[in-house]
A protein has these predicted regions:
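Conserved CoA-thioester-binding segment of acyl-CoA-metabolizing enzymes
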Residues: 1-64, 98-101
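Amphipathic alpha-helical segments at domain termini/boundaries
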Residues: 1-28, 33, 124-128, 168, ...
C-alpha cells in the first residue's frame, strides 16, 4: 500500500494505492462531525484527480467515507452564502462540474460505497462513479433534498440520476425531496449492488474492480427523451397548489428535465443555467433563513434535560398523543384525567400508534409498559415534568396548576400546552411562578414533530432550557 502523493498535506482525504493498483479515496472532512463538501474538500479532490490522471499503473478507483455512520451530507450550504451573485454561483458550479466530469472520464473502472446518509451533493459525487454500492442498513438514505431550500441539484446529479432511473423517478426524487432507502435505490436502478453492512463494502468493491480487469464499463441511458406523460403528470401533481413566484423550484425542475431529457450529460450541464437564479432568488433565501433558524433551535435543544418521568394531565386527543410520543421516546409516562374512559381510550390509541411506528412486538410491549393510567393523579409527585392539556379555560388551568404545585417536586417543571392564554395569567396564582413554562404541541402530535417552547416574565431560564432539551429529546 502506498500513498497517493499530491505534494500537499491533505486535511480532508486519505488516499492510497494498494498492491492491485486500486486507488482508495477516503473522505473525512476535517473539523466536521460528518462529511460535507466544502470548498477545501473540493480543492484537495482536484489535486487527487491530477494524480489519478497522471498515474499509468492504476487498475481502478474507489471512494468511501472515512467517518463511520454516514457517507456525505451534501455541500456546505453556509459556504454558498459567500457567493453573492448568479455569476459567482455559476463559476463555482463550473469548477465542480469540471472536477466531477474528470472523475467520470478516468480510463479505469471506478466505484463508490455508501453506508448511511448520501444526500444532495453527497449523492451527486456518488453518482460520478461507475458502480454504486450501498449497505442494507435502515440508516442508508439517498436523495435530493435541495427543493426544501428552494433549489435543485447543482453538481450534475440531475442528469446522472436521470440516466439511471428515468423521468418519473428523478422528478419524484427532486421535487418531493424524500430520500430513498437502499432497497428502493436498488429497485429503481439508482444503486447497483447491496451488501449487509459497512464492513462488507470494501470487499465487494475490490472484488468488482478486480473483475473488471482494468476495463471501464460502458454506461447506458435509461431513456432517450423525457417521458411526456410523466412530465404532464408531475405538473399536475406538484404545481397545482404552488405559486411559481413563491415556490419556483418545482416548476424549474420539471422544465429542466423536459428540456434535457435527450441527453443525461446535457441535463447535468444544464443545471448551470437554472441553479444560480434559484439560489439567489427570494424564495431560496427565505427557505435558507428558516433552515438556519430551525438549525439554531435544534442546537439549543441539545443536551441532557434530566427528564425521565413525564406526567400528563388531560387525556383528550392532545394530552393522550403527548403521552404516547413521550412513551415512544423512552420516558416513563403517567396519564391522568377525571374521566377514566378518556384515559383508557387514549391508551388504546397509543397502542395503535406504537404498532404502526415501532413494528416489533417487543418494542410495542415495552412502550405500553412505559405508559400507565393514573386515575387518582398521585403520580404527579414523582414526575420530572408535568404537562397540562385540559380545556382552554383560565380558571380550570389555574386550579390544575395550584394543585400540581403542592403535590409535585420542587424541581419539577410545570408546563401548559396552551396556545391562547398568556402564561402570566396562569402563573400569577402560583407561589413559584418561575416553574411554569409553555410547551405547545401541534396537532396531530405524532405527525408534526414541532414543539413551541414559551416562557413568561416569571419563567426560570433553567426550566426553559430543560423544556427545549425535552423537545429535542422526544423529537
Amino acid at each position: 500500500m502506498r500513498s497517493l502523493n499530491t505534494g500537499k498535506n491533505l486535511l480532508h482525504w486519505l488516499a492510497s494505492v494498494d498492491e492491485d493498483g486500486i486507488a482508495w479515496l477516503h473522505l473525512q472532512t476535517d473539523g466536521k462531525s460528518v462529511n460535507v463538501l466544502t470548498h477545501a474538500v473540493m480543492a484537495e479532490l482536484g489535486s487527487l484527480v491530477d494524480q489519478l490522471e497522471a498515474s499509468e499503473d492504476l487498475t481502478g478507483v474507489a471512494m468511501l467515507s472515512g467517518k463511520p455512520g454516514g457517507f456525505v451530507y451534501g455541500a456546505d450550504i453556509h459556504e454558498f452564502e459567500t457567493l453573492k451573485t448568479a455569476g459567482n454561483v455559476a463559476n463555482h458550479m463550473l469548477f465542480v462540474h469540471g472536477l466531477f466530469n474528470r472523475i467520470e472520464a478516468l480510463p479505469v473502472p471506478s466505484c463508490v460505497g455508501v453506508d448511511g446518509i448520501a444526500v444532495g451533493g453527497g449523492l451527486e459525487i456518488a453518482l460520478v462513479f461507475d458502480r454504486l454500492f450501498v449497505t442494507s442498513s435502515p440508516k442508508t438514505k439517498l436523495g435530493f433534498p435541495e427543493v426544501n431550500l428552494g433549489i435543485m441539484p447543482g453538481y450534475g446529479g440531475s442528469g446522472r440520476a436521470y440516466g439511471r432511473v428515468g423521468t418519473k423517478a428523478v422528478l419524484d426524487m427532486m421535487i418531493s425531496g424524500r430520500p430513498l432507502g437502499s432497497q428502493d435505490a436498488i429497485k429503481n436502478g439508482l444503486a447497483d449492488d447491496i451488501v449487509d453492512n459497512a464492513d462488507d463494502l470494501e470487499v465487494a468493491m475490490r472484488q468488482w474492480l478486480l473483475g473488471c480487469k482494468g476495463e471501464k464499463p460502458s454506461l447506458t441511458q435509461l431513456e432517450t427523451a423525457a417521458d411526456a406523460t410523466e412530465i404532464a403528470a408531475a405538473r399536475d401533481k406538484y404545481l397545482k397548489r404552488v405559486r411559481a413566484d413563491h415556490t419556483p423550484a418545482p416548476a424549474a425542475i420539471i422544465d429542466h428535465v423536459e428540456n434535457f431529457g435527450h441527453d443525461k450529460s446535457a441535463m447535468s450541464a444544464g443545471e448551470v443555467g437554472v441553479f444560480p437564479n434559484l439560489m439567489i432568488g427570494r424564495a431560496s433565501k427565505n427557505l435558507r433563513r428558516v433552515f438556519y433558524l430551525t438549525d439554531a433551535v435544534r442546537k439549543s435543544a441539545r443536551g441532557v434535560s434530566g427528564i425521565k418521568r413525564l406526567h400528563v394531565v388531560g387525556a383528550g386527543v392532545m394530552g393522550g398523543d403527548i403521552a404516547a410520543v413521550g412513551a415512544m421516546a423512552g420516558l416513563d409516562v403517567t396519564l391522568a384525567d377525571m374521566n377514566e374512559a378518556a384515559i383508557e381510550g387514549a391508551i388504546a390509541r397509543a397502542k395503535k400508534l406504537f404498532e404502526r411506528r415501532l413494528k416489533s412486538d417487543d418494542k410495542v410491549a415495552a412502550a405500553l409498559a412505559r405508559l400507565r393510567a393514573d386515575f387518582d393523579g398521585n403520580d404527579a409527585a414523582d414526575a420530572d415534568l408535568i404537562i397540562e392539556a385540559v380545556a382552554e379555560k383560565l380558571d380550570v388551568k389555574r386550579a390544575v396548576f395550584q394543585k400540581l404545585e403542592t403535590v409535585s417536586k420542587a424541581g419539577a417543571i410545570l408546563a401548559t400546552n396552551t396556545s391562547a392564554i398568556p402564561l402570566e395569567d396562569i402563573a400569577s396564582v402560583l407561589k413559584a411562578p418561575e416553574r411554569l413554562i409553555g410547551l405547545h404541541f401541534f396537532n396531530p402530535v405524532p405527525v408534526l414533530p414541532l414543539v413551541e417552547v414559551i416562557w413568561s416574565k416569571y419563567s426560570d431560564q433553567d426550566m426553559v432550557n430543560r423544556g427545549m432539551q425535552f423537545a429535542g429529546q422526544i423529537g
